[in-house]
């Protein structure tokens, strides 16, 4: 699932490197590097120091974490891993209420580590819904965090955004018809888009072909969801789609164009496939999806061909404290053995 960069030095192939050749070797432009989401809802996970070592050994150059953790941030010092750091939804009210609160958050969780931790993005909130009580605070929190980062002298290094999911779409088929739901736009999304355009920051989108497939298996084939279709499945004007992931991303691009955000880029902040516990879950399906995902995003989408799509694979480990059952099995690695669950070979 993760996107790994090859070192380009075959002579360094030690026993550890042989283990990780099972995982993705990726060479491409900087923006095409992919990361892995490091969720921590498990009681058997490796220590943060061990996790950072595993990222480095596997050549995973980008990480997403779902909230600031001093333990994790300390472990990242000097690692050269680029970080997507979330601000949890329950922090939005506090950060929107006061610039001082935002300044303190940035000082405590970014500035104090920025000399040797490579912060790439801050995601202010994750999958905020219009009905959430904190939705009204999202845009003010974005603005306050942006000012705090700029005041800390990090404005050229750290981009501020938020992550939505494809449930924000009113239409997604065909992709060119993509549009956002009016309640999302009214609650916060129009303000988010204006903010991102003004600050030249990407929109983050969690894209799960798994959920789209399991919600509608009559109309969506498993091959289309797993990037296995041998030919075009959806013809949308001059653009042909052979997989659901590209169609989903391009539907968001189309929706952005209709909402004044046509200049924005997308970062896929989560995507993956579970290996057990639910419909269409297996090691083979997880391996197939994630292998093909990493290959596919290097090339862009039909709407934006040749523009590599920065993507974060979900997730680094199986997390045994999540529910329902299938939510426990998205990991690339076993948390106990710290070994890959299946091979993904891009050589």
Curated annotation (Swiss-Prot):
<comment type="function">
    <text>Is thought to be an important plant defense-related product against fungal pathogens. Is capable of releasing soluble and highly active elicitor molecules from fungus cell walls.</text>
</comment>
<keyword id="KW-0326">Glycosidase</keyword>
<feature type="active site" description="Nucleophile">
    <location>
        <position position="270"/>
    </location>
</feature>
<dbReference type="GO" id="GO:0042973">
    <property type="term" value="F:glucan endo-1,3-beta-D-glucosidase activity"/>
</dbReference>
<protein>
    <recommendedName>
        <fullName>Glucan endo-1,3-beta-glucosidase</fullName>
        <ecNumber>3.2.1.39</ecNumber>
    </recommendedName>
</protein>
<dbReference type="GO" id="GO:0005975">
    <property type="term" value="P:carbohydrate metabolic process"/>
</dbReference>
<comment type="similarity">
    <text>Belongs to the glycosyl hydrolase 17 family.</text>
</comment>
<keyword id="KW-0926">Vacuole</keyword>
<dbReference type="GO" id="GO:0005773">
    <property type="term" value="C:vacuole"/>
</dbReference>
<keyword id="KW-0611">Plant defense</keyword>
<keyword id="KW-0378">Hydrolase</keyword>
<dbReference type="InterPro" id="IPR017853">
    <property type="entry name" value="Glycoside_hydrolase_SF"/>
</dbReference>
<dbReference type="InterPro" id="IPR000490">
    <property type="entry name" value="Glyco_hydro_17"/>
</dbReference>
<feature type="signal peptide">
    <location>
        <begin position="1"/>
        <end position="32"/>
    </location>
</feature>
<dbReference type="GO" id="GO:0006952">
    <property type="term" value="P:defense response"/>
</dbReference>
<dbReference type="InterPro" id="IPR044965">
    <property type="entry name" value="Glyco_hydro_17_plant"/>
</dbReference>
<feature type="active site" description="Proton donor">
    <location>
        <position position="127"/>
    </location>
</feature>
<dbReference type="Pfam" id="PF00332">
    <property type="entry name" value="Glyco_hydro_17"/>
</dbReference>
<keyword id="KW-0732">Signal</keyword>
